[in-house]
Amino acid sequence: MANEINIYEPRYLAEAVRTAPQIRTFLRDRFFSNVKTFSTERVDIDIVKGNRKMAAFVHPMVGGEIVQSEGYETKSYAPPLINPAIITTADLFLRRLPGEDIYSGKKPEERAAEKLTDEYNKLNDMTTRREEWMAAQVLTTGQLKVKGKGVDEVIDFGFTNKINLENTKQWGKSAADPWGNLCDWKQQVSRNGFANTDMVIMGKQAANLFMADSKILDLMDKRRFDIGAMAPKELEGGLTYYGHLNLPGVDIYGYDEVYLDDTDNTTKPLIPDNMVVMIPSTANFMRAYGLCTYLDDDKKWHTAETARLLRDYVEHRPDRHFLELQTHPLLIPDKVDSWLVATVC
């Protein structure tokens, strides 16, 4: 029929991707907001480590000194494939279903489009949660472990600002000094990573120990020493705002969002309970997407420079109609050592 609608045509699938509601993910959206798509399967990125070298004094008759290009390293990465699929039933909604009101105001293609969008949202939600997990892994370890069917590798970004408090220096123990730690760590990042870390994100146990620390409570009670204020309040998406410290100049947050670990089927926090992350609130790391490719039913290869590719295909024995999402994301902290992570308890 000339007017028959095929909801699986690329233009309809692309519209489903475009109109889908966005999931809000704190770590991914806040710190990896520099989104770029690439026309290649590999992504080449300049990893920057700055310095504080000063310009030299020179005699007027000698002339200027040539400044050597330094401080960055170009690395090539192959973004991992994320490729969830679902058996779609959206095409069934093009026909009136048994028991459906024949006077329903919705057109068949509208019902089918709604079902298609629901199915895409399910795939997109899973993919977005994986990207949030990737952001957490990169920020808390400086690495990304890519492990799945047929793939097992570690992408290391060369991150070195890692602290591990031991023995009585751990928070909650006799020699603990959370306030002093934050002051020292901020200075460390300023000197080694050339960044102003004005935001602290704590795991649940770390946050509880920080808020209960006797030195912190004592400093807050000193009327002539305005160190800051703690006024906890819950925000959306598992985020809690605890307050602000004027010295060392940081806002303190807790992040309680969890994920289902598919390796052991247990629920785990994205920010480990015993960990603290100090990071610039203005961090603008890269969220890169490699080229998507697929083979169609006519055995022709297609490519797309996009963050999400949605397509359908048919398999037989048994006959099934699949809806598939493809993406090649890689979250890249291109300004290495501009943040710090610490295991505090």
Please give the residue ranges for each predicted region:
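N-terminal alpha-helical "arm" segments
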Residues: M1-V43, I332-C345
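A general structural signal for short secondary-structure junctions and capping/turn motifs
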Residues: V35-K36, V189-F194, M199, K268, ...
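Sequence/fold signature of self-assembling virion shell proteins
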Residues: L217-C345
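Assembly/oligomerization interface modules of large self-assembling protein complexes
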Residues: N34-I102
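Long, contiguous amphipathic alpha-helices that act as assembly "spine/axial" helices in icosahedral shell
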Residues: P84-F159, D177, N181, Q187-Q205, ...
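Ordered core of a single globular domain
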Residues: G180-L239
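A surface/extracellular/periplasmic glyco- and lipid-processing/surface-interacting theme
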Residues: L165-G180
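Extended, non-catalytic scaffold segments that flank or surround catalytic motifs
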Residues: V43, K53, V154-N161
